[in-house]
Amino acid sequence: MSDRDIRCSFCGRTQKEVKKLIAGPGVYICDECVKLAYDIIEEDEEEDVTEEFEDFVLPKPHEIKNFLDQYVIGQERAKKILSVAVYNHYKRIFMKSKITEDVEIQKSNILLIGPTGVGKTLLAETLAKFLKVPFAIADATTLTEAGYVGEDVENILLRLIQNADWDIKRAEKGIVYIDEIDKISRKSENPSITRDVSGEGVQQALLRIVEGTIANVPPQGGRKHPYQEFIQINTKDILFIAGGSFEGIEKIVEKRLDVSSIGFGAQIEPKNRKSLTQILNHIIPEDLIKFGMIPEFVGRFPVVAVLEPLSEEALLKILTEPKNALVKQYKALLSIEGVEIDFTDEALRSIVKEALEKATGARGLRAVMEELMLDLMYELPNLGIKRFTITPELVYNRGKISQELLKKLAG
């Protein structure tokens, strides 16, 4: 058979009519038919995703924020930033057909910056709950790069797959929250010559799954070895939210702002008038790089939201107002036993003050409440008391509340 007679087995074009003609056992396929076949497969995959999430209704940013408001007190700016970022992320996935072919919208992962106990994890958790997508939490401090003792980054994806009931398609549209991300900063701005097990190496390992790749996940967890089978998962549509306190980064920001503000007409605000949040709201990627995050990693988290430290008033609202407020939870638990409890305003203030001393934000509230309620939940059902008021005296005596004290206060 001459070159002139060689044709594509699918469209019939000759070798001269196409750019490439690929030969197989007794058949030929041209480059145009390869592209057409690829487009058909891609279209089918998109249809599969649409069918999998056909009941998914993308809420508007206002609706997302309204739901967050039910569980997270304060943090208005952070909630607004998150709502828009999440809306755009899922719009990019589910509305591809409405985006013109000459525009490629990249994934916008989110970085949350704020002190311990201000609601970083709760925000990510609540978003996943509202959107009804799989969710997984990872602690960056437990991760190590391949070859070192610790946890492989792929195990984060295994948790997501498990939480999606092993449905890979659902997991590929999930949310992953990585806590303590600031703890894997490298020790200096200069790239390390030696291995940095807990810093730069982990950032490099995370970078691959965060930016979008086909990851091989060991189904049993643990370290990968060459003889085991893997689950493959595409991470390009997984939303990664990273959180950290980034203690000390405000000094980097202040230094840059002070230097840049020196000049004719510059408005210099005294340092003592700037709150920590005001300073952190001026964070730029270069500040994160100076802190120890590698440039490529910073580039994969273009959306940055700063969370404010919690005031006494905010903690009081957290204690009583959200759907999952601790006071509401304990009241509901004791009501099942037929016991109605109430808290005086002074008792609530006492709980907040005790929590503030712990300097762990909303986590301090839980610690104080659990210590207070342990004895009450143990003793009250046995004492036949049907109604009980919690006072500051009980708050300050928590951990050593006796039956006699309870009877006296109930009496």
UniProtKB/Swiss-Prot annotation:
Membrane-spanning segments: none
Gene Ontology terms for molecular function: ATP binding; ATP hydrolysis activity; ATP-dependent protein folding chaperone; protein dimerization activity; unfolded protein binding; zinc ion binding
Residues annotated as domain ClpX-type ZB: 1-49
InterPro entries: AAA+_ATPase, ATP-dep_Clp_protease_ClpX, ATPase_AAA_core, Clp_ATPase_C, Clp_protease_ATP-bd_su_ClpX, ClpX_bact, P-loop_NTPase, Znf_CppX_C4
CDD domains: RecA-like_ClpX
Disulfide partners: none
Binding site for ATP: P115, T116, G117, V118, G119, K120, T121, L122
Entry's Gene Ontology cellular component terms: HslUV protease complex
Any one GO biological process: cell division
Record keyword Transit peptide present: no
Pfam families in UniProt: AAA_2, ClpB_D2-small, zf-C4_ClpX
Keywords for this protein: ATP-binding, Chaperone, Metal-binding, Nucleotide-binding, Zinc
SMART domains attached to this UniProt entry: AAA, ClpB_D2-small, zf-C4_ClpX
Family: Belongs to the ClpX chaperone family.
Oligomer and partners: Component of the ClpX-ClpP complex. Forms a hexameric ring that, in the presence of ATP, binds to fourteen ClpP subunits assembled into a disk-like structure with a central cavity, resembling the structure of eukaryotic proteasomes.
Function in brief: ATP-dependent specificity component of the Clp protease. It directs the protease to specific substrates. Can perform chaperone functions in the absence of ClpP.
Listed name of the protein: ATP-dependent Clp protease ATP-binding subunit ClpX
Organism (species): Dictyoglomus thermophilum (strain ATCC 35947 / DSM 3960 / H-6-12)
